[in-house]
Regions:
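Short, mixed-charge low-complexity intrinsically disordered segments
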Residues: 37-56
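A short, exposed loop/beta-hairpin motif centered on an aromatic-Gly-Thr core
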Residues: 14-26
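Generic secondary-structure boundary signal with a strong preference for alpha-helix termini
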Residues: 12, 25, 37-40
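Short aromatic-glycine-(Arg/Gly/Cys) micro-motifs in beta-strand/loop hairpins
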Residues: 1-15
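Short, non-transmembrane alpha-helical segments in secretory-pathway proteins
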Residues: 31-36
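A short, polar/proline- and glycine-enriched secondary-structure boundary/capping micro-motif
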Residues: 28-30, 43
């Protein structure tokens, strides 16, 4: 597994920063969006952009 830092930008201007271990960048992005949804930041239609960076 690799370590990722994910930044989820919402249409209401909120930036959500999330760190996790995942197999792929796609999986890390999905985990971050789910964590944002659980935190009440917005659903999938509210996401403007998801930026995934692998930490080496």
């Amino acid at each position: 597994m690799k370590h990722f830092k994910v930044r989820v930008q919402y249409t209401n201007g909120i930036d959500f920063l999330f760190e996790c271990d995942a197999v792929t960048g796609w999986q890390a992005g999905a985990l971050a969006r789910v964590a944002g949804r659980i935190a009440g930041l917005g659903g999938s239609m509210d996401v403007k952009e998801t930026i995934v960076v692998e930490v080496v």
